Each structure stands twice: as C-alpha cells, then as structure tokens.
Amino acid sequence: MMMPLTCNVLEKLSGKTLCTAESCTGGGIGAALTAVPGSSEVYKGGIISYTNDVKQKLLGINPFLLKNLGAVSAPIAEAMAIGARNALNTDIAVSVTGLAGPGGDDKGNPVGLVFIGYADDKRITSRRFVFSGDREEVRNQAVEAALKLILDLN
C-alpha cells in the first residue's frame, strides 16, 4: 500500500541521509522505509520516543516545554526532529507526535491530532493533522503523511 510512496521518498533522497523520531507511530515510518531493499543507503535509523522521559533523554527535549506545551504540539515535533538529526547525524529528520487513541490527553487535545516535524540544514518546520479512524488507522495515516511531507520538502 505505501510501498510506491516509500520508494519515491528513498529515490528522491538519494545521496542524502534520513532518520526518524517517532512517538505515536511506534516505528511505523522506519518499518515502511526498511521494507524497501537498499533503504540503508538513505535511512540511518530512528528513535522511538514513546514517553516524555525518552524524549528528554535521547532527543534532548526541554522538560519545561513538555510540561507546558504537552508532548503533542508543533514545537515538540520540531524539537524531536532536531534532536534526532543531531543524535543520528543525518541530513534530514522527520518526527511524529500525536494521539492515536483511544483517549485524548490532559491538554484537551483530541484523538487523531498529530504533528509531524521536519528538520534539515535549511529549515525546521512542522505540520498539524487531525486524522479520523481507530488507533491503527490514525497511525497509518500519520506514517503516510510523514512520507508525503518528506517528498513535499525535497
């Protein structure tokens, strides 16, 4: 289903390196990328930062930001991408943080709210999405949106 999209991403990034920082997708972007033979030429690895503690320790996310903004926010998505890019020393990083369900969070964010972050040597940005469906559908839509964002920005 996502194989053509994933192949397009890897082809477009030929000569560059990519890493991921994933929360609600739990490694789904990395799994999609590594399903393609030869993906190691581009994809170097990822950090699954499902908890705030891991976001702080492995990605260097400021605990003050996490406490005040919550993990599901544009600044956190951007900081995750920066942290992954720095930790894994790649040209490009994409990150995902969101609420796949079944419940929202203590900040009042709804199920399906996802922020996808992106960092390269020219820009740091993020996009906000609200996906519908069950937990698996939200996660799959987030993976697809992250891959499309990489294509759009390269």
Language model features by range: what are they?
Residues 1-154:
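Short alpha-helical segments enriched in small residues
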